[in-house]
Amino acid sequence: MKKNTMKKYMSSAALGLPLVLLLAGCHKTPEISYAKDVEPIIKKNCVECHLQGGKGFVASGFLVESYESLMKGTKFGPVIVPGDPLSSSLYRLVAGEVDKSIQMPHGKDPIPASQITTIENWIVQGAKNN
């Protein structure tokens, strides 16, 4: 009897394991596109202050007019560390992981959580110009 029970268990495991592995792969984050996903968030929430002559540009030297200017960062250094959102000040500023007085967008409603997650995932995926 023990042999039959063990055989049933092994059969169930052999059938179930591939299914579990398949389902685990279904939750992979899709590739985030700078042009399609991130740039619209930046344009909607950051452009007003971070263009030439804007208050954000004057204070920090940070322009968001292109991918290149975004990756260049501020006069103090880069704001994005590809692969590492927690070391990326852009992510930390919009995610509210800083003092409220410097949270971005400054003086406006916070960026929706889903859009912050998009920025985070884009950085995790290497902050590519795609």
Q: Residues of each region from the PLM?
A:
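Compositionally biased non-globular segments, especially hydrophobic aliphatic-rich helices
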Residues: 8, 16-17, 130
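Hydrophobic alpha-helical segments, especially transmembrane helices
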Residues: 8-9, 116
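Intrinsically disordered, low-complexity segments
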Residues: 9-10, 31
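Short, surface-exposed loop and linker segments with low hydrophobicity and enrichment for Pro/Ser/Thr
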Residues: 11-14, 27
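Bacterial N-terminal signal peptides
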Residues: 13-22
